[in-house]
Amino acid sequence: MVQGTTSDAGKSVLVAGLCRVLARKGIKVAPFKPQNMALNSAVTKDGGEIGRAQAVQAQACNVEPTVHMNPVLIKPNSDTGAQIILQGKALSNMDAVGFHDYKRVAMGTVLDSFAKLTDEYESVMIEGAGSPAEINLRENDIANMGFAEEADVPVIIIADIDRGGVFAHLYGTLALLSESEQARVKGFVINRFRGDIGLLESGLDWLEEKTGKPVLGVLPFLHGLNLEAEDAITAEQELSSQVKLNVVVPVLTRISNHTDFDVLRLNPDINLRYVGKGEKIDKADLVILPGTKSVRDDLDYLRSQGWDKDIQRHIRLGGKVIGICGGYQMLGKLIDDPNGVEGSPGKSEGLGLLDITTTLTDSKQLTNTHAQLCLNGKTANVKGYEIHVGRSEVQGAQPLRLSSGEAEGAISECGQIMGTYLHGFFDEADVLSLVSEWVNGTQIKQQDFEQLKEKGINRIADAIAQHMNLDFLFK
């Protein structure tokens, strides 16, 4: 089990790399994360929902993701509450206190999923969450040492040296564990190192002497891995000298599945800009409203930032707009939440840019989807997925045709505004080319996104093979 001294220490990446190392050896391996808190999620083949990081790790294993790889997924929908996904299905909304009490019940489900994976696979690589040394979260813990003790698994602890204080992080984390938990820790990994390793050796010697635990590896800082993030937005880009398309995405307070835009960010011909609080939406060919876990609240936030007026001005100047999932719902005339699915029951007036009305319902649509997009008399095949509550009634043209034959999405009479429920909408090369032509007449050739992810996974595995003591780790 890989645990970390902090969030974003490199747990997800290390597990993905170790999974690929084992898969290369012909070992049947699967990833597992008992509890994940993230708004970036993926749909499994059997119609369940898990954290996106576990889907990437499953890809590293060369296996299909299943709900048992992430049995508890927490999707925050307010500062104090979240939707709880249990073995792929929405259980209920809980506040922090309610979930803290529920964890003692959830442990049984977590162990059930883990048992199913251990029965099917030769090896299971487990990822913890946050830090095992969060004193206030130790009771009923299912994410870190609480699970490790119940499942009786060995642990390695990873820390990020790039943020500073790596020896304090590792030494302090170990010191805050119980004696039995300390005995379970087999070693440390230092992540994101850059520089001369010789300058680090005295510190490594000190750490090993003080803790009695070996440093199993020092991993280099790997830029541009192109893997879908668990939650944090990545804005890093390498642009060509002649950008063909300027895209702006407003960052909503509960933005979800912003991995939709990775394929745009990684294209050197596209300047993707995330607009945050206090910033204006301007200088764009295309504005994309992203998905959100709290549509009505984020619609209020969008208006509080003046972005509704920015979008109207953008359209008057001939710009294009696309809404994805929750962003699609916002573009309509009305969002009705009669049962309080996302908070207090009530209705919100939409932006009125598409002739649709949406009713939020208790049931969640979870499916992997194939469709055909038709724009300006041309077509392209879309491969995406749906994760949403609610149904939208559409009046007027619909630009997508699902493989089932059902129409999907909506497009305005003026032809400048479009919406769809499909996440992953831009991933296919033909779709991006067709959309860019619709936006400003340019032809953009998309890189193979799956190939980029594979390259990133292999780079991690290569670094692990070179810089970690795998003989000790896997003995």
Swiss-Prot record:
Claim: Transmembrane is one of the keywords in the record: no
Residues annotated as transmembrane: none
GO molecular function, one term: ABC-type vitamin B12 transporter activity
Any GO BP annotation: cobalamin biosynthetic process
Catalytic site: C325 (nucleophile), H423
Keywords: Cobalamin biosynthesis, Glutamine amidotransferase
Annotated NCBIfam families: cobQ, PRK00784.1
Role noted for this protein: Catalyzes amidations at positions B, D, E, and G on adenosylcobyrinic A,C-diamide. NH(2) groups are provided by glutamine, and one molecule of ATP is hydrogenolyzed for each amidation.
Protein name as it appears in the record: Cobyric acid synthase
Source organism (scientific name): Vibrio campbellii (strain ATCC BAA-1116)
Source taxonomy: Bacteria, Pseudomonadati, Pseudomonadota, Gammaproteobacteria, Vibrionales
